[in-house]
């Protein structure tokens, strides 16, 4: 479970909840602006799309899915399925047209953020994947596992990838 501040409106944030919902809040308000029924099981992560052109969120859940939402219309744009266990996180890359997800199945998945097609699956044999950090100025992505961490240099080659 986490919270994410909207980069387009720093007075708005989203929270992911084990009750299967994502709530959108205004800073200072004791009640959410609205609640979205997001996943069939607990929601582990929520993140806003960093660009100005789309009002999107990405969420992950214990239902093994990654979902992209239009938070203005409160509708699911796409459900991405490929992980075989709870999905710990998913983030929009700030500079490249990809979504990066990590799961308790031990894999990192790279998705095309325009077509939502799975582009690559990485498995370093370090057990469950738990957390991610992006270097906004570059294309490095750090991923934390049960048994260590990996720093990836992500770049586009051909149609997409590492």
Segments the model singles out, each with a brief description of its role:
Residues 29-34, 73-77, 115-119, 159-162:
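Beta-strand initiation motifs
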Residues 4-10, 28-29, 47-54, 70-73, ...:
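Loop/turn segments within WD40 beta-propeller blades
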Residues 37-43, 80-87, 122-129:
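WD40/WD-repeat beta-propeller blade N-cap
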């Amino acid at each position: 479970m986490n919270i994410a501040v909207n980069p387009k409106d720093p007075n708005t944030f989203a929270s992911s909840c084990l009750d299967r919902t994502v709530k959108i809040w205004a800073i200072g308000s004791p009640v959410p602006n609205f609640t979205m029924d997001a996943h069939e099981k607990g929601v582990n992560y929520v993140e806003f799309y960093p660009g100005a052109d789309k009002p999107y969120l990405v969420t992950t859940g214990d239902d093994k899915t990654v979902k992209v939402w239009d938070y203005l219309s409160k509708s699911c744009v796409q459900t991405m399925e490929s992980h075989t266990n709870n999905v710990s996180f998913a983030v929009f890359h700030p500079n490249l047209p990809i979504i990066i997800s990590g799961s308790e199945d031990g894999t990192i998945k790279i998705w095309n953020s325009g077509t939502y097609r799975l582009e690559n699956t990485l498995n370093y044999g370090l057990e469950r994947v738990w957390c991610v950090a992006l270097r906004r100025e570059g294309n490095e992505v750090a991923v934390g596992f049960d048994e260590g961490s990996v720093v990836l240099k992500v770049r586009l080659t051909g149609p997409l990838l590492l």
